[in-house]
C-alpha cells in the first residue's frame, strides 16, 4: 500500500509540472485529461501526507516516553497525545483504503438526468415532476448548476419526460445511484374515493460526454428545424428556432426549443444527443462485459425498482440497501444527503469486502 502511495505522490508532483507546461496548456484535450487526473489524486496525496505526520507524532511520543526522566504531568500529556495519534492513524488507514479503491472514471463528471413518467398515467407524470424538483433542490444545496434541457409537459403539469444538465464538482459520484424505477404510493389528486394508488417514474443518470470523447458524424445525423410551440401546440415564434436531431444508426432522438435562438437550441441538442448515444453504446459494452463496471448497489438494471416513496406513512425505502426513513417530505424537498451518503458507504464497503477476499 505504501509503495502505491509513494508512486501516487510522485505522479501528483509530475502532473503539477506538466500542467504549468505551455505546450500542455495549449492542448485542450490533454490539459483537461491531466487536470482530471490531478484532481483525482489530490485527496489521496493530502490524506497520505496527514497520515505521515501522524506516524511522526507517534514515533516522537514513543521515543520521548522511552527516554525517561520525565515528570508525571509530561508523561500523562505524551500518553494522551500518543493515544489520540494511534486512533487517528486507524481512521486514516481506513480512509486511505477507500481512496485507493478503483475509481469510476465518470465520478468527476457533470450529468444528464432523464426522468420519465412510467406506469400510472397522469399520476406518474406528476411524480416525475416531484422527482425533478427534488433533484433540483438537492443540486442547489450542493452549489451545482441545474438546467432543463428537454421537457414534455402534460396537461396537468407533470412530465411525460424531462431532461436536465446538472453541472458541478462530483455530480456523477453522488447521483449515479439514482438510476432505476422510483415507485410512489399516495392518493392521486384525481382520486375521489381517497384510495392509495401506486405509480412509477424512471430515472436515468448519464455522465455528460465531452466533445473530444464522442463526435457524431454528419452522415449519421438528421437535423430538422421547426417553429417552437407553446401550451396547446400554438406557434409562439415566427422564426424557426426549435431543433430536432436524430442519430440514424440508433434512432435516438432529441428535441430542443427551450432557447430563443436556433444556434443555442442546436448546441444544447447536440450535447444531449452525444451523451445519449455514448450512453447507449456504453451500456451495450457493459452488458458484454457481464456488468463488470456496474455499481455493486443493486443489479445495475435500469428497470430495477430501487426506491419507494410512501406518502401516507411519510416513508422512503431504498430497497437495494434496506434503508427506511420516515422523512419523505424532507427528502422530496431536496434533503437527500442521508440517502446518498448511505448508498456511497454501502458501495464502498462492498468493494472493500471484494478487495479483501
From Swiss-Prot:
Give GO cellular component annotations, separated by semicolons. cytoplasm
N5-methylglutamine modification sites are 234
SUPFAM superfamilies reported in the protein's UniProt record: Release factor (SSF75620)
Q: What gene does this protein come from?
A: prfA
Q: Which organism is it from?
A: Lactococcus lactis subsp. cremoris (strain SK11)
Name the source's superkingdom: Bacteria
Query: Is Glycoprotein among this UniProt entry's keywords?
Result: no
Q: Which InterPro entries match?
A: PCRF (IPR005139), Pep_chain_release_fac_I (IPR000352), Pep_chain_release_fac_I_sf (IPR045853), Prokaryotic/Mito_RF (IPR050057), RF-1 (IPR004373)
What's the protein name?
Peptide chain release factor 1
Q: Key word Magnesium present in the record?
A: no
Q: Any idea what job this protein has?
A: Peptide chain release factor 1 directs the termination of translation in response to the peptide chain termination codons UAG and UAA.
Disulfide bond annotation, renumbered to this chain: none
Amino acid at each position: 500500500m505504501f509503495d502505491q502511495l509513494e508512486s501516487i505522490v510522485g505522479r501528483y508532483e509530475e502532473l503539477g509540472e506538466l500542467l504549468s507546461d505551455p505546450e500542455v496548456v495549449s492542448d485542450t484535450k490533454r490539459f483537461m485529461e491531466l487536470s482530471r487526473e490531478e484532481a483525482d489524486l489530490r485527496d489521496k496525496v493530502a490524506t497520505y501526507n496527514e497520515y505521515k505526520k501522524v506516524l511522526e507524532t507517534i514515533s516522537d511520543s514513543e521515543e520521548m516516553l522511552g527516554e525517561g526522566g520525565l515528570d508525571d504531568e509530561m508523561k500523562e500529556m505524551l500518553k494522551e497525545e500518543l493515544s489520540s495519534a494511534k486512533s487517528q492513524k486507524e481512521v486514516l488507514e481506513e480512509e486511505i483504503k477507500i481512496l485507493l479503491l478503483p475509481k469510476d472514471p465518470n465520478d468527476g463528471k457533470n450529468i444528464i438526468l432523464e426522468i420519465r413518467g412510467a406506469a400510472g398515467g397522469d399520476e406518474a407524470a406528476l411524480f416525475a415532476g416531484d422527482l425533478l424538483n427534488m433533484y433540483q433542490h438537492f443540486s442547489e444545496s450542493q452549489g451545482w448548476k441545474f438546467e432543463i434541457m428537454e421537457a414534455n409537459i402534460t396537461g396537468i403539469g407533470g412530465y411525460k419526460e424531462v431532461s436536465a444538465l446538472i453541472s458541478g464538482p462530483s455530480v456523477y459520484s453522488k447521483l449515479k445511484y439514482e438510476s432505476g424505477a422510483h415507485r410512489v404510493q399516495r392518493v392521486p389528486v384525481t382520486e375521489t374515493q381517497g384510495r392509495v394508488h401506486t405509480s412509477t417514474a424512471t430515472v436515468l443518470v448519464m455522465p455528460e460526454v465531452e466533445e473530444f470523447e464522442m463526435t457524431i458524424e454528419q452522415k449519421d445525423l438528421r437535423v430538422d428545424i421547426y417553429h417552437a410551440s407553446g401550451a396547446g401546440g400554438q406557434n409562439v415564434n415566427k422564426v424557426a428556432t426549435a431543433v430536432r436531431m436524430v442519430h440514424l444508426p440508433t434512432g435516438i432522438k432529441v428535441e430542443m426549443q427551450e432557447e430563443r435562438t436556433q444556434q443555442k437550441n442546436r448546441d444544447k441538442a447536440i450535447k444531449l444527443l452525444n451523451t445519449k448515444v455514448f450512453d447507449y453504446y456504453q451500456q451495450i459494452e457493459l452488458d458484454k462485459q457481464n456488468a463488470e463496471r456496474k455499481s455493486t448497489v443493486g443489479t445495475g438494471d435500469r428497470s430495477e425498482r430501487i426506491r419507494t416513496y410512501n406518502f401516507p406513512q411519510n416513508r422512503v425505502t431504498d430497497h437495494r440497501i434496506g434503508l427506511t426513513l420516515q422523512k419523505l417530505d424532507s427528502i422530496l424537498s431536496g434533503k437527500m444527503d442521508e440517502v446518498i451518503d448511505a448508498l456511497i458507504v454501502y458501495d464502498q464497503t462492498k468493494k472493500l469486502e471484494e478487495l479483501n477476499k
